[in-house]
Amino acid sequence: MGTIQNLKSVFDYLEARNLGAAIIGLENYLTIHPNQVNSDRLHAIRTDCQLMADYWKRGFKDPQLPSLFQALLQRLYVLWGNICRSYAIGHNSFMSSIYMRQHMSARDWSPQNILEELETFVSNVAILELEPSQQREAKRRELYCQHQHDMNVLFDHILTSADLWTDGIAMAMEEILLSPTVDTNDQQLIVSAVMLSSMELFDIAKFRTLVHVYEKAVDERVRQRALVGWVLALRGRLIATIYPEQIDLVHHLLEDEDHCKELVELQEQIVFCMHAEHDTETIQREIMPDLLKNQSLRMTRNGIEEAEEDPMEDILHPGEQERKLEQMEASFQRMVNMQKQGSDIYFGGFSQMKRFSFFNELSNWFVPFYPNHPDVMEVLEKTGMNRFLNVMMEKGPFCNSDKYSFVFAFQQVISQIPQNMRGMLERGEATLNELPSEELESAAYIRRIYLQDLYRFFRLFPERSAFVNPFDMDGSFLFFADPIFSKTHLELFFNDVTAFFLKQDRLYNVLKLLSNYGEARRDFQFWMMYGYLAQHYANESALAFSDLQCYTNALEIQPDHERALAGLARAFFYREMYKEALETYDKLLTICPDKKSYRLNFAASLTNLGQYDEALKELYRLNYEFPDDKKVNRVLAWALVCEGKYEAADKIYEQLLATDNVYPDDLLNYGYSLWFSGHVDEAADCFHRFLKEEDYDPDFILENEAVLLREKGISEPEQQLMLYLL
């Protein structure tokens, strides 16, 4: 068995609480990959397990047995986790390199020393103000440069530390993350490192730390990073087996309705992040062309220049300038509205600006933007304190990662900008979409820009394959489907989140969400959403309920609900249960007697039941009221075919087929009409075109309307000859 498979099988045994098999699995692994420390730890676990078994088999009833067994299971998981972490680091060149960097630093990684270093930095920054002005800037650069290096290595240490945290380390790190004497930027970066480490390998101590920081943090930026951290670190498979404490931690949070609302917002914001590429395509295809063609700038070999105004333009095209401005403003406003709704409108542009050397450093993808970052200070020294740049970094609608990109790109293009525009920038007169302070400080905004930082990392970092991507389709982004939230207070918000995913047409995700509902929460809206899913989801075998069941259950709760009746009618119709469909559409017509779709489907049900006279009466009325409605004409034509009125049907089909976009079923049904009226060659031509469009086997022509063919007197030899022609 391969190494990965061996470690995977050990986890499967742990999940199944099969302690003995898990011990044997690790013993087999350590036989192939000997390590004295791990072997000693495993031997101690086996010894304790044997003592427990010996005591039990002698007939003693130990009330502490369940807790002792659980403790052994957790000790074995910790050992397994340490081995997995070491294996992952040793078999990935990137992870090995950052592990070696922090390992070779020879620093004291105890939480006490980390706290002391962080507090000393804050003190040194304060002392800077007492330095003579001629020395202050040089010392500032030196101080921040050394501190950023130290934070980079600390980030690497947290990520690649071979051992899972003990409870003591977790409590001490929690103190650091909540301390008012530690810089918030440092706390935010540490939280991101803890999150990234926990996503790679679940660590209950780190998870507990993130939950506690989310509960207790005063700084909203630290708090929101902790929220995202524990959510993305959730591992539902471990809940009931190895660490039931995870349930208690999460359920305690869910007692607060504000926490539940934040989780709803977070789930929706994650999805908006995942639409970044699609939103970029929309902007590039539909919005940017309008903005570019209406602007008065042009690119030259010397950079951007203002285009000269044509004095004849106002004479030849009066009002054209105003029209262009209105069109450009409308395009820009559309982009602003996309951003307000949660779209990541800047991903496309800034995704091309992640090749600066700054982004080679792992922790720089997570560090909050601050002007004293050594790389930023270097740029500001070259460009000067540009007011435009300052305002954009303070109030611009960008995530931290994009702010860094903006600064480095700004340095490269500033010399190519026209002089008059450069003057505007230096005076701070040309800023873009500044955000008010209250929005910048809001929890929702802080969380959104952090998610955008994460999305850029997992999509653009060159070594991203070394990490578990939560934004993948099978990643942890769909946390509302985690079993830990089932049958909790959060279920009160399940319908809102599921409806959101339905609007996004993410049916695969909707199925997972609906599967997480407890039976007590299967209310009217649940059955309506599941019914919609059942009628639109391709993989029927994955569904727990059929659309017929769902709409029937919904109507038991609200008997005369129009949408539920409409869903039930469709379910009957799709199953060719035309009598039941007819009865249901009849009920709908008592509620909405003039609704065209109900009248049309009522007539279609009559047609399929062979009640052609009644069907045609309604269809003629609909055709009179809606003469250009193709759906009405389509059903009318087919009813005429069934009634034997082929000439009238053919006229309608000729109209339907005289368009650029031919509906394949019109070819098929016109073919039947021609065949029944004796125009075999023309019928075969229609069938040929239909089969080519749909890529069906010729047998479909006979199987699709086998009953009608017999009713129309088409003999078996005639049917076989048609197949011969096809």
Describe the role of every protein-language-model region.
Residues 526, 564, 598, 632, ...:
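TPR alpha-solenoid repeat register
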Residues 229, 529, 567, 601, ...:
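Canonical tetratricopeptide repeat
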Residues 35-36, 219-223, 490, 523-524, ...:
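Residue-level recognition of tetratricopeptide repeat
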Residues 364-570:
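Alpha-solenoid helical-repeat scaffolds
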Residues 22, 510, 544-547, 581, ...:
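Single-residue signature of alpha-solenoid repeat helices
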Residues 16, 504, 537-541, 575, ...:
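Structural motif corresponding to the intra-repeat A-B loop/turn of tetratricopeptide repeats
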